[in-house]
């Protein structure tokens, strides 16, 4: 009989309900805020990798003039300039060049108005007939590819753990 009175008293007591509701909503809001922070950090770091890749391509263009093409074989300061530019963002040395980067080749615009690689720099084609544009001349492009190992701040709690990692980006720059 005593137990049933205690259970009935607990059912009618409302003093702790507000604290329980607050704890539930605070935890939901906290998880939401952790997601916002993690996603914002990911977007910022991805943006920095994109900027670093573009900076590397611009450094290649700035370092190697048209008289020293192809740049990968005739421009002695190319790798140093590109590496320095790629690591000039707030991410620093954590942004690295991918294996085989920088690479250079001849590109033409195909029928879909997209750049298409037609050959290495070792053998320059006479025109772009290989992609269906015989009236166009191929351009010398350098490709810079970078990578950054992203790690979420709150693994297992936020959706940022499902994002692509590492973050990789590629930039093309016409040299000649």
Regions found by a protein language model. Name each.
Residues 12, 138-140, 167:
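Residue-level preference for short coil/turn positions at secondary-structure junctions
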Residues 46, 50, 54, 90-93, ...:
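A general secondary-structure boundary signal
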Residues 57-145:
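Short amphipathic secondary-structure patches
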Residues 5, 26, 65, 99, ...:
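Solvent-exposed, flexible loop/coil residues
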Residues 2-86:
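Alpha-helical assembly-interface signal, strongest on the long, hydrophobic N-terminal helix that forms
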Residues 38, 133-135, 160:
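Residues embedded in well-ordered secondary-structure elements
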Residues 145-176:
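Low-complexity, S/T/G/P-rich flexible repeat/linker segments used as non-globular hinges
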């Amino acid at each position: 009989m005593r137990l049933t009175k205690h259970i009935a008293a607990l059912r009618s007591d409302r003093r702790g309900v507000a604290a329980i509701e607050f704890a539930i909503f605070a935890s939901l809001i906290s998880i939401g805020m952790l997601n916002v922070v993690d996603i914002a950090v990911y977007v910022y770091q991805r943006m920095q990798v994109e900027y670093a890749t573009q900076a590397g391509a611009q450094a290649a263009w700035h370092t190697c003039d048209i008289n020293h093409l192809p740049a990968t074989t005739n421009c002695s300061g190319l790798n140093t300039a590109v590496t320095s530019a790629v690591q000039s963002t707030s991410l620093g040395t954590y942004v690295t060049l991918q294996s085989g980067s920088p690479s250079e080749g001849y590109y033409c615009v195909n029928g879909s108005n997209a750049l298409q690689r037609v050959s290495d720099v070792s053998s320059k084609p006479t025109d772009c007939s290989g992609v269906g544009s015989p009236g166009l001349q191929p351009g010398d492009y350098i490709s810079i590819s970078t990578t950054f190992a992203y790690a979420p701040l709150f693994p297992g709690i936020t959706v940022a753990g499902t994002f692509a990692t590492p973050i990789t980006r590629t930039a093309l720059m016409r040299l000649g």
